[in-house]
Amino acid sequence: MSKIWVLGDAVVDLIPDGENHYLKCAGGAPANVAVGVSRLGVSAGFIGRVGHDPLGKFMQQTLKAENVGVEQMILDPKQRTSTVIVGLDDGERSFTFMVNPSADQFLEVADLPQFQADEWLHSCSIALINEPSRSTTFEAIRRIKQAGGFFSFDPNLRESLWKSLDEMKQVVNQAVALADVLKFSEEELTLLTDTTTLEAATAAITAQYPEKLIIITLGKDGAIYHLNGESKLVAGKALKPVDTTGAGDAFVSGLLAGLSQSSDWKKESVLVDIIRKANASGALATTQKGAMSALPSKAQLEQFLAE
């Protein structure tokens, strides 16, 4: 069974619960993906830094309780754990980052594990914002490819955290160029390709990288994949959303769980089935508040697919 390493930020999400209260929820896209993968029965390890503080210990204990490997999760005594206030309006979300730079931005090469052949590394763009995390992330990508593994990238753009839009595009596109698997939202893809329509953005990215598995998520409508000149829309199941915070991360968890356990994932019938399950994982995650708490188990996913 191939292991999935997830590199990046582990975040404490503060989610409104009534007028004067916030729920403290474990979050951060990479941490969510690691937990999501583990709940689906696949081996997962987290690579990243949190503060040596109550919130950092809370994150480490949370991941450990979910059977995610935390040997590469460093408690940094000099930095603070990333904390985000999540705003919800009709189920859609907004983010206010309370700690910048946070501990995750201080990841060092010495924090990286020894990668093995056929393992997967997944990351998001927050890991690329500042040094030393940026250089460490690119070194992790180099090492996993050298070991005979795969790199998956979900930009998950947070423009407000970057010094400039130009720097964000330049650095994120460097990671895009190195990925075997890419997951974009429509807005992210048009921004990164300097286009204004999904059609133009898709044409640009597939012409540049025909050999990569490129997936564009379309919310309740499912996802479109492109690979080696082939493309297909894989429809999703619509559910009434309570909170969309973890939907993208749940999709990625389902996707990685499927890809990592299949040696012939580039075959159309296999890929369609993997993406169908990823769509279902994303849909299920919208039915509860909080990103991590809503991630489905393997049993929940199988039951939903059977309905």
Explain the meaning of each model-derived region.
Residues 100, 126, 156-160, 187, ...:
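Active-site beta-loop-alpha junctions enriched in small/polar residues
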Residues 147, 161-233:
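Conserved phosphate/ATP/ADP-binding segment of small-molecule kinases
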Residues 1-3, 142, 198-307:
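Conserved phosphate-binding/catalytic region of the ribokinase-like
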Residues 43-123, 303-307:
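Conserved N-terminal subdomain of the carbohydrate kinase-like
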Residues 37, 185, 248:
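Short, conserved phosphate/pyrophosphate- and ester-handling motifs at nucleotide-, phospho-/glycolipid
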Residues 10, 126, 155, 250:
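Active-site metal-binding loops of divalent metal-dependent hydrolases
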Residues 35, 83-87, 222-226:
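Short beta-strand scaffold segments in enzyme catalytic cores
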Residues 1-69:
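Glycine-rich phosphate/adenosyl-contacting loop at the front of the ribokinase-like
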